[in-house]
Amino acid sequence: MRPRSALRYSLLLLALAASAAIQAQPKTLAVCTEAAPEGFDPARYTSGYTFDASAHPLYNALAAFAPGSATVIPALAESWDVSADGLVYTFRLRQGVKFHSTDYFKPTREFDADDVLFSFQRMLDPQHPAHDLSPSGYPYADAMQLRDIIERIEKIDEHQVRFVLKHPEAPFLADLAMPFGSILSAEYAGQLIARGKGDELNSKPIGTGPFVFTRYRKDAQVRYAANPDYWKGKPAIDHLVLAITLDPNVRVQRLRRNECQIALTPKPEDVAALRQDPQLTVLEEAAMITSHAAINTRHEPFDDPRVRRAIAMGFNKSSYLKIVFGDQARPAIGPYPPMLLGYDDSIRDWPYDPERAKALLKEAGVTPDTPLNLYISTGSGPGGNPARVAQLIQSDLAAIGIRVNIRQFEWGEMVKRTKAGEHDMMLYSWIGDNGDPDNFLTHNLGCASVESGENRARWCDKGFDEAIRKARMSNDESQRVALYKEAQRIFHEQMPWLPLAHPLMFDAQRKNVSGYRMSPMSARDFSRVKLD
């Protein structure tokens, strides 16, 4: 070989080696998130912030939603059959699925029917040894009255389970795809309980999902490693970091400095500028979301529907939408967004009419300067800046004689306090988890949810409750539509919420990120992400 050719050959080898070294470097995806998780057992919580850190990266359920849609597809169950009467669901479980192996748990077997039975029976059976590991109960299972839906769960063999229902339940498959249906390791839970460390099920999670939990630094970050044994294949990124960043301005700053490659829910007013940045891409989704203020109907004088209607007529919703969202939201009139089954577009919003609102308050015997304690969280989510929204409510209601006291708490603290019913009003954004109206209605407004604390309005209307119960049990779509319209009319007349907006949702990412897709249910899945 001539010297010059040898030199070229050597340089080529060096270049190839350098390229291989670069490709071999671990790829870390950092995501700036809006709030800290409350824990890592999805069955114990209802917050999307918690699910982003638990259900989506760590676990799988029997079924799932197709990326970017509400279509139910197989997950840990590779297929299922439903009996003609809608009462028996038989699931064939996926084989060869491994639970995470960590420094605190080494599984000795693969996922099987015992894990399905454990994951559901702990919620359903008060005598189950794992039931009391969640001191506040299982909010979704309780609010959905899962015990009144499921007659029994049977293990047919290692790879088949059967759910027998007490009555038909239209959204049952979609319900099972929700985060509360995440499948945990019965083997791991049994070891923890035997050692008297059952609480670690919520702090040292083990699942079958795309990422393995490595560390949580409270209120700062959650770290994960790619699951090398993931049944769908190892994720393209090696490490995932959820960087808890309450301030949306700081989330954007960190994104621009490449400290985060994805920033969740930037402020709507920042979206236009973000779209002009050549290093960034803005993703947009018409999510299933209703931002609202739940009014505690157990507190006087807000137990009177006239007072709640007065609040609706005293609030300038058009001004609020313009100030908080620009043109990035539509007004909310009812409890769920227009894209869902049975939405009644014939219902008209209560008009902005401060004088009529004052007259209603006077008719209800409400004296001027009546206090209202409005609970809000720190940070900013899809419903906009809570403090700014609260100030607008405060200003408008002052004009009709209601003095709003704003009380702001960290997210988890606000959830705890409002679940206990301390508030007169609470700002909240509910994002649908399964693409069905029932997810908005039964969980947030059903009578059973009053006792569990998930119904922040503490409102129980028997006519409303009966309508949504019948709709949930019917497989006749036209009947469901009629029942949901009946429920919406009752809601509109009673006004347990001040419905605010159905906002668009936004996430921002750097140009070198691909494979991330938003979901109408706001489920964040980072398992398909690639970093170029």
From Swiss-Prot:
Q: Name one GO molecular function term.
A: peptide transmembrane transporter activity
Q: Which InterPro entries match?
A: Peptide/Ni-bd, SBP_5, SBP_5_dom
Q: Which UniProt keywords apply?
A: Peptide transport, Periplasm, Protein transport, Signal, Transport
Give GO terms for biological process: dipeptide transport; protein transport
| GO CC annotation terms, alphabetical | ATP-binding cassette (ABC) transporter complex; outer membrane-bounded periplasmic space
Entry-linked Pfam families: SBP_bac_5 (PF00496)
Where would one find the signal peptide in this protein?
1-24
State the source organism's domain of life.
Bacteria
Query: Where, subcellularly, is it found?
Result: Periplasm
**SUPFAM superfamilies attached to this UniProt entry:** Periplasmic binding protein-like II
Q: Which family does it belong to?
A: Belongs to the bacterial solute-binding protein 5 family.
Question: According to its UniProt entry, what is the function of this protein?
Answer: Binds different tripeptides. Probably recognizes specifically tripeptides composed exclusively of L-amino acids.
What is the protein name given in its UniProt record?
Tripeptide-binding protein
